[in-house]
From Swiss-Prot:
Principal EC category: transferase
SUPFAM superfamilies in alphabetical order: PUA domain-like, S-adenosyl-L-methionine-dependent methyltransferases
Gene: rlmI
Organism: Vibrio cholerae serotype O1 (strain ATCC 39315 / El Tor Inaba N16961)
A GO molecular-function descriptor: rRNA (cytosine) methyltransferase activity
Protein's UniProt name: Ribosomal RNA large subunit methyltransferase I
Residues annotated as signal peptide: none
Amino acid sequence: MTPAIYLVKGRDKSLRRKHPWVFSRGISKVEGTPKLGETVDVYSFEGKWLAKAAYSPHSQITARVWSFEQEPIDRDFFIKRIEQAQLLRNDIIERDGLTGYRLIAAESDGLPGITIDKYQDYLVCQLLSAGAEYQKQTLVEALLHCFPECHIYERSDVAVRKKEGLDERVGVLHGELPPKSVVIEENGVKISVDIVGGHKTGFYLDQRDSRFQSMKYVKEKEVLNCFSYTGGFGLYALKGGAKRVINADVSQPALDTAKFNAELNGFDISKKRAVFLNADVFKLLREYRDQGTRFDVVVMDPPKFAESKAQLDGACRGYKDINMLAMQILNPGGTLLTYSCSGLMDQVLFQKIIADAALDAGRDVKFVERFEQAADHPTDTAYPEGFYLKGFACKVL
């Protein structure tokens, strides 16, 4: 008999709207002794069947819904979800000429806690939930059915797994260990990805659309690319005809890859055109401000400042300070391209932070364009939490 959980009276409303999470405070009782990650049936307080979900007793999100249909959660289920996700992305892949893209965007693709990025013939899995870990072998079998020629590598080296009672894991799940450099292409730009040692699963695929849209602002401009990582925005700036691009990052290996990427695309990397600067961005911006160094375009794409609600106030201060500094080093009429990947910070709050930064910088600033995550990172209508990346193009007068 399948284990089951019963909800507190009245706590079934979100599930009836197809939201995929059940919180611990919403559960009245558990029937049976489900294992960590095992599939359970979810019932309302009155005993009406609602969903099949993965059980995670250590997490505040105690159950994550696999399906709102009475169906087995087996190999065929995962094959169906993967095929649906691939079909959703086929037009995007053709349009943007992609050899690297997000195949599975967790809850938004009906596979909670599972993120899968495809880089050429390498599928890179990040399994964030107990249910994802429990179904790992079944998931691998389904992936091999859909992509029989692919190697599969796990990058579940993320702290959030501890909340699920899981250890961090990395390693080969099928095939060969990825090489140090796997070259992908997007919008005609070649990018070297370090799957094993890079950030996230190797690269920030979610910023692809923003990178492409940034090109309209950079022609014949002096561009400062902050938190450049392996140079994504810098590559598009060079492609878009920027006069000069300074890529600033605290990681020398990332800067080395950024330089390699520029060479890979045949761009001029003389110091007159491209600079790769190892620096703390906060300190660098203050130095530029105090020295009177100015730019036409500043790209501000920092790492996530808020991992929890307790960190949100500090994150707000950090975002405000860094955007204020960016505004202070822009020439009149310059463009600030600024982004936040903190899911806890919604677009309204981020917009207010930019407004506060403008006041502190003493600059008149206009929002002229809004950005969000790339199209292969969809957001399900029932899961607004899937919308996490937001950005603005601002004219600084």
